[in-house]
Amino acid sequence: MEAKGGTVKAASGFNATEDAQTLRKAMKGLGTDEDAIIGILAYRNTAQRQEIRSAYKSTIGRDLIEDLKSELSSNFEQVILGLMTPTVLYDVQELRRAMKGAGTDEGCLIEILASRTPEEIRRINQTYQQQYGRSLEEDICSDTSFMFQRVLVSLSAAGRDEGNYLDDALMKQDAQELYEAGEKRWGTDEVKFLSILCSRNRNHLLHVFDEYKRISQKDIEQSIKSETSGSFEDALLAIVKCMRSKPSYFAERLYKSMKGLGTDDNTLIRVMVSRAEIDMLDIRASFKRLYGKSLYSFIKGDTSGDYRKVLLVLCGGDD
């Protein structure tokens, strides 16, 4: 399948100073023109939004982020501030939010660390250290435990082979070792699962999954479900899903954030904001294929007001 890409593109005829003036006007005086804010920020890409922020400061003498914070609230504010945050910094802030205070948002940690490329994870590590004066790994270790901690540390080390090379003998050996680490024995050698799933390249792993099915008569996902549990299981499944298809993985994250009663707004916002420029069109196609309904219709039915408006713009259309 040819990748379709994102819904948010660079605006043509872009003028940062004009945009800055429009935003100021939308927030000056009584009330706020939310439509004007959406009309600009949801229709510019990340780089352009940074230029608008600079222009706002140099021509108006105020900080755009501070103004947005004082004018907006709740989920709508969270989306707009997310759009205003440079990509890597956004991931870093989400990882920090997932670990700060009581409780841990395991789903967020898994989603970011399992889906980003090694290069992105290296940048996340650098930025995390700059922002908080300690390493991402330190925070993971103080906030999580056991095998779940180990898989997150392994993913955060960005040690995955980035090549495309396939060594047939090693591929067969990996499949056999996974089989022997789980299905074939009583108990599970969890470290074996971790080391293979966190270090091999995507092409290699896809072949390992096929070979695994051939020798065990089971999908690797089925084995992970029966052999592991809790957040460790969730992390391994996320790695496998991201290797098979990132758009399908994110479609599932979105579906789960909205199905049933209530909405997991943090997940909905994070996926919509972080994937809008990358693969939102592919996510939409996967969503429709997997769930028989469009992502657009799900968002429309699950959200309201300006929050709904801005998410639908990021979604980019109905299917």
UniProtKB/Swiss-Prot annotation:
Matching PANTHER family: ANNEXIN (PTHR10502), ANNEXIN A4 (PTHR10502:SF28)
Residue numbers of N6-acetyllysine PTMs: 213, 293, 300
Annexin repeats: 14-85, 86-157, 169-241, 245-316
An example molecular function term from Gene Ontology annotations: calcium ion binding
Gene that this sequence comes from: Anxa4
Subcellular location: Zymogen granule membrane
InterPro entries reported in the protein's UniProt record: Annexin (IPR001464), Annexin_repeat (IPR018502), Annexin_repeat_CS (IPR018252), Annexin_sf (IPR037104), ANX4 (IPR002391)
Function: Calcium/phospholipid-binding protein which promotes membrane fusion and is involved in exocytosis.
Protein name: Annexin A4
Keywords assigned by UniProt, alphabetized: Acetylation, Annexin, Calcium, Calcium/phospholipid-binding, Cytoplasmic vesicle, Membrane, Phosphoprotein, Repeat
Membrane-protein topology: Peripheral membrane protein
Main location: membrane
Family: Belongs to the annexin family.
A GO BP annotation: epithelial cell differentiation
Gene Ontology CC terms: apical plasma membrane; cell surface; collagen-containing extracellular matrix; nuclear membrane; perinuclear region of cytoplasm; zymogen granule membrane
Disulfide-bonded cysteines: none
Positions carrying Phosphothreonine: 7
